[in-house]
Amino acid sequence: VTKLPKYDVPEGYDSWSYLNKLCDDGLAERYGDGDQPAGETGQTLRERLDYELGVIQRMGYVDYFLIVWDFINYAKEHGIPVGPGRGSAAGSIVAYCLKITNIDPIHYNLLFERFLNPERVSMPDIDVDFCFERRQEVIDYVGRKYGNDKVVQIVTFGTLAAKGVIRDVGRVMDLPYAFVDSIAKMVPNELNITLSRALEMNPEFRKLYQEDEQVHHLIDMCKRLEGLPRHTSMHAAGVVICQKSADEFVPLSRGSDGSIVTQFTMTTLEELGLLKMDFLGLRTLTVIHDAVKFIENTTGRHIDVDAID
């Protein structure tokens, strides 16, 4: 069971009717110049919207969409640059009508089922890009709205990788740094490389391992520790929003900078049915925003990046 927080809707609405109102308004704005789109095209759009809304309601994700709509709306109202859409969420006309995404799924013939499949129950996952410098403002807003005790960032565990474990174990064994560093540099610069794979790939490394007893002992110790957690840090984007105080669902810890983070990783939080959101800080958005401001300040001409075809 997903533990979704409730979104506080205006008086006279429930979550379902408010989501429908927002989507109707968005459909008129996106496709009908302020009026509901008419004719055969209008009927096709309405059928697609009603289909998606039906799936969202049956799967119990109405409040999820309202929560995402709300913090994106806050960002846009406060001049915080927001990305046009990332990943499978761009295939949803509901997301497009709510201005969660800015990519027309009908024009580009995108599939809603890549995002939310009625035959496979899984949490929708809307990753949102924000200006790198102002991302924290959006997280702070979510904390104020739902309660800072209910909104916490997510831990991530750094593990002992091939080169790092050689240096760490070498230091514990009190071996000379230059000697240990030279061994670590024999590990090829390859993504997710393991010590066993490095020994296969580098004949010089393998020869040293086979002939030097000290190196053999060092690498054997490293193999036993390789892949184990080394340290904790804060996930670059993940934030969990709870129905009740977060400590009722997960253990928490305080980071070195004083921030509160979960002790469970993102995967475990999803298994518990908690709402995990990705607030991604994207430097590209900051650069584009600064460039648009610079052009306006120097030429007086305002460029709407979203209107560039």
Identify the residue ranges that each predicted region occupies:
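Alpha-helical scaffold/interaction cores of sigma-54-like transcription cofactors
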Residues: 1-309
